[in-house]
Curated annotation (Swiss-Prot):
Protein name, entry field: Protein upregulated in glial subsets pugs-5
Region of interest called Disordered, as start-end residue ranges on this chain: 355-407
Organism lineage string: Eukaryota, Metazoa, Ecdysozoa, Nematoda, Chromadorea
UniProt organism field: Caenorhabditis elegans
Organism domain of life: Eukaryota
Bias-annotated ranges (Basic and acidic residues): 355-373
Length: 425
């Protein structure tokens, strides 16, 4: 009966002091280090912009940051504050509306409520849980276990595979206390576009998606690890978090005697929340960008409109190919024995004569009927066929009139012969 009364007492304490008292106090510690956190994020953003070259990575990173900021805002909800008026009544202060992330909070509101509820349950003392021996296992840094429960931007670094520090060990090792491996598996920047449909190979491939290579990662690491101001900001932030956590641990309601069980509970709740937030961020990124920005596919297109097939496909007119043949056929006559210069000259003369005939025909069609008579009489030249004189009688083979004589190939160079219906008898 005594145990049930104790449980009822602690439940009433939570209802009167706040919905999730200890969980909300832990999240409020992030505000004590907000000044240092903001400067750290600026250094990370500057290193990312200067080292990463692909525009698709910058587009995906921008959308990711908006969704991740919404998850942080949904988790760091301030507890309702109370104020006392002049008449002695206690009234709740209305919180300012969160306009910036209202459209994105739907992905993380329910998850953050479950996280805060499970986190607050870690501090509930249950009489049904057996007590451990006094000399049982303990943790080296209890503050780090509390800091692990603070939801900050460390998850963003893990999703991109870009750890905060790689040279020195952090003063507040939140991952080490929970034995969490900082794997190099990237959810973003791995060559799979998170802002495109996975079934569309035209928009989700290695050329149009974000892929961080080794040179970019090395540049990013050197820009941060070799910056003394950046490292000092991390130590200042951890120091501010540790001071806030130590003040929190002085409250008996947010302190546990079984430190090992408390660490296990805090680490397990945070790991589950990271998995839920990761799924929510993937949904948020796709919903934030229903259409792929044009710069992901076309570097020269606009960001405000989706590229069409007419823009993507370039209309190419095939070039006319010229072939250098060893001969040419003119009026059915093979002039393959001509030299290269003679062939070119014969082809040119043939083309010019054909063009002149086409021009004359088009000119005659365009002229008016009443003016065609006198002009045609002046331009038309009648050609009379003059018969060749009779050759002297001989016993050689006789040819018909106007029959051509045999010519050497060198004599036929540059000449065009117009002969029809020629037979040899």
């Amino acid at each position: 009966m005594t145990h049930l009364l104790l449980l009822l007492f602690f439940s009433c304490v939570q209802l009167t002091t706040g919905q999730f008292y200890c969980a909300d106090l832990i999240q409020q510690c992030a505000k004590s280090a907000a000044e240092y956190t903001e400067q750290i994020l600026q250094y990370k953003e500057s290193a990312f912009k200067s080292c990463v070259r692909r525009p698709a990575c910058h587009t995906e990173r921008k959308i990711f940051d908006e969704c991740f900021d919404a998850s942080v805002s949904a988790t760091h909800i301030s507890p309702p504050q109370e104020s006392t008026s002049n008449d002695g009544e206690t009234r709740k202060v209305t919180q300012p509306p969160m306009v910036k992330y209202n459209s994105l909070l739907k992905f993380f509101t329910e998850k953050s409520m479950n996280f805060r509820s499970a986190l607050d349950q870690c501090f509930v003392r249950s009489p049904f849980v057996p007590k451990r021996n006094f000399f049982g296992p303990s943790i080296l840094d209890e503050d780090a276990a509390y800091a692990r429960a603070i939801y900050q931007f460390d998850l963003a670094d893990r999703l991109w595979g870009l750890p905060e520090l790689s040279v020195t060990r952090p003063s507040l090792d939140t991952l080490g206390v929970c034995r969490t491996q900082n794997t190099a598996l990237r959810v973003f920047g791995s060559g799979i576009s998170r802002i495109a449909r996975a079934s569309d190979p035209k928009k989700n491939n290695l050329t149009s998606s974000c892929m961080l290579d080794e040179d970019e990662i090395t540049c990013y690491r050197q820009a941060l690890d070799l910056n003394s101001e950046y490292i000092q900001l991390i130590y200042n932030r951890d120091y501010a978090l540790r001071a806030c956590i130590q003040n929190l641990r002085q409250q008996s309601v947010c302190r546990m005697n079984d430190k090992s069980r408390l660490r296990s509970c805090l680490c397990g709740v945070r790991e589950q929340y990271d998995n839920d937030v990761q799924a929510g961020i993937l949904q948020c990124v796709k919903s934030k960008s229903p259409h792929i920005p044009a710069m992901v596919i076309e570097m020269s297109s606009s960001l405000d409109e989706e590229p069409t097939s007419a823009k993507i496909q370039e209309q190419v007119t095939p070039a006319q190919l010229t072939f250098d043949t060893p001969g040419a056929i003119v009026n059915g006559q093979c002039m393959c024995a001509c030299e290269h210069s003679a062939k070119n000259e014969a082809t040119r003369l043939f083309a010019n004569k054909k063009n002149n005939n086409d021009v004359e025909k088009s000119t005659q069609i365009e002229k008016k009927p009443e003016k065609q008579g006198p002009e045609i009489q002046e331009e038309v030249v009648e050609m009379e066929t003059v018969k060749d004189e009779q050759p002297p009688k001989t016993s050689a083979v006789r040819f018909k009139e106007n029959s051509p004589r045999l010519m050497q190939p060198s004599e036929a160079a540059g000449r065009v012969f117009w002969m029809n219906n020629i037979t040899i008898t």
